[in-house]
C-alpha cells in the first residue's frame, strides 16, 4: 500500500507489486511532495464597544504549501487599528499538513473627539459650551441640551443624537436676537416744591419691546 502523510502526496513505491525476487537484496523507495494547497485560517478580531474583549469579525480561509511559514496580512477596518502586540496574536506559523493552523490578528477600536462650538456672535450670558468628549467608534452619542442666552433664541445643535463615526465631530449652534425683548421707559415729573425729580413718585412708566442688544431711544411724552 502507498504511504501517506498529512499535507503531502506520495510518489508511489519504486517497484511494482508482485515482482519476482531476484538473487540480491532489494530496496524499494518512495518520496513525498508537499501539497501546495494545504488549508489554514486567518481570524480577525475587533475590540468590543462595551469592554476590552474582542469578537471575531472575519475569517479568511487560505491555502499554502505544507510545512512552510504563513504570515497573516492585517486588514483595514473602518474605525479600528491593527494591534500587533495584542495578547493572543498569532501573526505567522507553520502550515500544518492537517490544515489545523489558525493565525489570529487583533484590532483595537479607535476613539474620536466630539466638540461643541458656537458660530456667529456669542451673546453675554450664553451657556458655557459642553466639554469635549472622547468617544469610541460605534458608540451612541447623546447631544447636549440646547444652549440659552437672555434675549436670544438658540438655533439648536447641528446634530441630533448619533452613532460615533470614524472621525472627529464638531457640533455647532448659533443665537438669534429676539425682536420682542421688553424694556421700560420711565417718565419722571419735577417736584412741585423744588427742581428735583423723585424716582419713586410722580412717574409714568411704559413697557416697550425691541431687538436684543440694539440701541433704542426714549420718546418724550
Positions of predicted regions on the chain:
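Secondary-structure capping and domain/repeat boundary segments
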Residues: 1-221
Amino acid at each position: 500500500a502507498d504511504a501517506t502523510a498529512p499535507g503531502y502526496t506520495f510518489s508511489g513505491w519504486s517497484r511494482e507489486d508482485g515482482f519476482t525476487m531476484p538473487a540480491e537484496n532489494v530496496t524499494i523507495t518512495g518520496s513525498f511532495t508537499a501539497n501546495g494547497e494545504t488549508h489554514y485560517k486567518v481570524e480577525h478580531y475587533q475590540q468590543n464597544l462595551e469592554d476590552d474583549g474582542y469578537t471575531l469579525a472575519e475569517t479568511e480561509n487560505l491555502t499554502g504549501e505544507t510545512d512552510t511559514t504563513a504570515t497573516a496580512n492585517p486588514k483595514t477596518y473602518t474605525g479600528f487599528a491593527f494591534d500587533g502586540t495584542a495578547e493572543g496574536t498569532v501573526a505567522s506559523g507553520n502550515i500544518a499538513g492537517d490544515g489545523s493552523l489558525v493565525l489570529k490578528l487583533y484590532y483595537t477600536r479607535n476613539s474620536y473627539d466630539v466638540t461643541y462650538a458656537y458660530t456667529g456672535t456669542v451673546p453675554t450670558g450664553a451657556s458655557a459650551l459642553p466639554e469635549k468628549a472622547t468617544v469610541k467608534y460605534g458608540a451612541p452619542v447623546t447631544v447636549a441640551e440646547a444652549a440659552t442666552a437672555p434675549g436670544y433664541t438658540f438655533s439648536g445643535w447641528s446634530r441630533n443624537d448619533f452613532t460615533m463615526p470614524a472621525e472627529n465631530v464638531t457640533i455647532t449652534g448659533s443665537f438669534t436676537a429676539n425682536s420682542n425683548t421688553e424694556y421700560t421707559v420711565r417718565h419722571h415729573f419735577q417736584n412741585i416744591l423744588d427742581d428735583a425729580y423723585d424716582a419713586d413718585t410722580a412717574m409714568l412708566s411704559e413697557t416697550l419691546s425691541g431687538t436684543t442688544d440694539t440701541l433704542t431711544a426714549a420718546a418724550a411724552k
